[in-house]
Amino acid sequence: MSMRSEYCGLVTEHLLGQTVSLCGWVSRRRDHGGVIFIDLRDREGLVQVVCDPDRAEMFKTAEGVRNEFCVQVKGVVRNRPEGTTNAGLKSGKIEVLCHELNVLNASVTPPFQLDDDNLSETTRLTHRVLDLRRPQMQHNLRLRYRVAMEVRKYLDSRGFIDIETPMLTKSTPEGARDYLVPSRVNAGQFFALPQSPQLFKQLLMVANFDRYYQITKCFRDEDLRADRQPEFTQIDCETSFLSEQEIRDLFEDMTRHVFKETIGVELDAKFAVMPYSEAMSRFGSDKPDLRVKLEFTELTDAMKDVDFKVFSTPANTKDGRVAALRVPKGGELSRGDIDSYTEFVRIYGAKGLAWIKINEVAKGRDGLQSPIVKNLHDAAIAAIIERTGAQDGDIIFFAADRAKVVNDSLGALRLKIGHSEFGKANGLVEAGWKPLWVVDFPMFEYDEEENRYVAAHHPFTSPKDEHLEYLETDPGRCLAKAYDIVLNGWEIGGGSVRIFQEDVQSKVFRALKIGAEEARLKFGFLLDALQYGAPPHGGIAFGLDRIVTMMAGADSIRDVIAFPKTQRAQDLLTQAPSEVDERQLRELHIRLRQPEQKA
């Protein structure tokens, strides 16, 4: 018999009476009146092993094993005694009567119990190897594998070719910071780790590969949040000779396929489509969570002449906005709840949170409860009631500031209330999956500090055909052929139709204040390639980490990555990053300069 004949978690009634050889780790050892029970674990699950004292040598070994010992068990599969079955285990109706027990490798005492659900993330990441033995982590990483496998199967069936692109490439600092790699051979010069394979996949379209994909690592040296990592995995795709609509249809179908085949979820037969401007107007976000039923109401125009300066000042400011958020049945919220929400929106730059409780609509002003009502004239109050559709028992929250602050703060409040216990109890949030496409993004954003336009997506995104004329006259009016796929408030993918004509690409560079010499230095290889009959092309990139996080119901993308970094971009397991030897620095012609001490 080989070292292992079956996986522990796959031993069931079909093997009754058969001798099996199992290998795994001791999850738990119990001594019950002279009989020792071992829960043996491998990647497929648990099986109960019974060690009877009749076999003295084997029993003596069993007495010495402890949690996380790596062992081999040989024994016979039998039914568990009546009343001792475990419906929670696939192997719960059987047990293995041990004939032979071999300790393949002992274990020191683990720093924690693997079934402890209250471990700090620091402990888990420091002892990641043990953490990965936990069933939930095993499940998450196998789910990740299945998602990648289904993506490959789907794209292969549609004629896509998996092509690797370079990991050592040229630094083009437009956007997030690059991770730089010094060149020993070319002193004083640096490679950059790719933020995405963007330019290479466009070059592959020019090179007539027609349909490309790869599941690849990307790197961005940016401040980290719960859903960000310095290195992350992208499902990167590009295709030639398809329109924007055809590209969206193709990858919408792929998304449906992957969700159905991996977790059995049937996404909408047709995803909703929403322009960027509508998403910002209704939800204050370009990745709205459509499960939450609350929406903004625009009030800027109605608040221009009120005596309440908190409203009238932003209403009369170029970039100002006044918006309301009606919460059905919110009148039952306590003053403590309101104060808590007020402090919450301050996180997003809001100076405060105005509110009105609707006690009785029919009474007009007299039916409202709020410290701000006295500062609003009748026309403003009528506009609030009519536009929000307020009913008795509701509360209306208001945000008034620069549009970005209003969108960020009221958008965050919308999600907080919707997903709260109050929101769930009052039907303000739906269960399930709500996918949509957000389209018609601005081509450019204006950077006040740099006094120039910057690319809202990236500088290789094509403007809409009817907006080409604005590139040189009014770039702020340009909309892009860009699209994001959003699911339950998470952007899981984004892409665009690309610029495929050299003259248009040069115009975009000029709009970004990238001069001809700088453009040639940074992107000359792309501009040259576009002159050789480049085809119309476009694509998309999905965030594999985010998709698996959502499918697994995990708290963080760190729970679906085998060896992740912390929010300080550190690997607690290997202690990276670390100092390097002075000799290595000399070989790279690098001298370290100590950071200046802050006063």
Curated annotation (Swiss-Prot):
It is found in: Cytoplasm. One of its GO terms (cellular component) is cytoplasm. GO terms for biological process: aspartyl-tRNA aminoacylation. Residues 198-201 are annotated as: Aspartate. Its main location: cytoplasm. Keywords: Aminoacyl-tRNA synthetase, ATP-binding, Cytoplasm, Ligase, Nucleotide-binding, Protein biosynthesis. GO terms for molecular function: aspartate-tRNA ligase activity; aspartate-tRNA(Asn) ligase activity; ATP binding; nucleic acid binding. The record marks 32, 83 as: Important for tRNA non-discrimination. It catalyses: tRNA(Asx) + L-aspartate + ATP = L-aspartyl-tRNA(Asx) + AMP + diphosphate. ATP binds at residues 220-222, 229, 491, 543-546. The keyword Magnesium does not apply. Its EC number is 6.1.1.23. It comes from the Bacteria. L-aspartate binds at residues 174, 220, 457, 498. Pfam families: GAD (PF02938), tRNA-synt_2 (PF00152), tRNA_anti-codon (PF01336). CDD domains: AspRS_core, EcAspRS_like_N. Homodimer. Aspartyl-tRNA synthetase with relaxed tRNA specificity since it is able to aspartylate not only its cognate tRNA(Asp) but also tRNA(Asn). Reaction proceeds in two steps: L-aspartate is first activated by ATP to form Asp-AMP and then transferred to the acceptor end of tRNA(Asp/Asn). Belongs to the class-II aminoacyl-tRNA synthetase family. Type 1 subfamily. HAMAP family: Asp_tRNA_synth_type1. This is Aspartate--tRNA(Asp/Asn) ligase. It comes from Paraburkholderia phymatum (strain DSM 17167 / CIP 108236 / LMG 21445 / STM815) (Burkholderia phymatum).
